[in-house]
């Protein structure tokens, strides 16, 4: 079975306390679906080909369906509510090869 991934790029963060509240709720919600954080890049980032230096998070799930279910879960919705408008993000759910 192909794995599923969340690829999240933070375009801007306007409320660090909202982001911390989001992370406190999102992490256990993601892990309850077997999600594993591959990177939470706040350190070294090298960009190429018109890329933007954005905080990027990659989470791996055992399947695309689990990745989608985690995003649609009640626990993760509560995390999104805590984040509110504290960050502008590009959030993608993709299937591995």
Language model segments and positions:
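Short S/T/G/P-rich N-terminal loop/turn motif that feeds into the first structured element of a domain
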Residues: 1-55, 62-68, 72, 95-97
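C-terminal structural segments of small proteins and small subunits
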Residues: 67-92
């Amino acid at each position: 079975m192909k794995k599923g991934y969340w690829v999240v790029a933070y375009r801007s963060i306007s409320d660090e306390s909202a982001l911390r509240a989001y992370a406190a709720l999102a992490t256990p919600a993601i892990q309850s679906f077997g999600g594993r954080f591959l990177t939470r890049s706040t350190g070294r980032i090298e960009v190429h080909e018109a890329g933007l230096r954005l905080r990027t998070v990659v989470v791996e799930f055992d399947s695309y369906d689990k990745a989608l279910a985690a995003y649609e879960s009640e626990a993760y919705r509560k995390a999104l509510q805590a984040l509110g408008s504290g960050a502008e993000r590009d959030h993608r759910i993709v299937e591995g090869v």
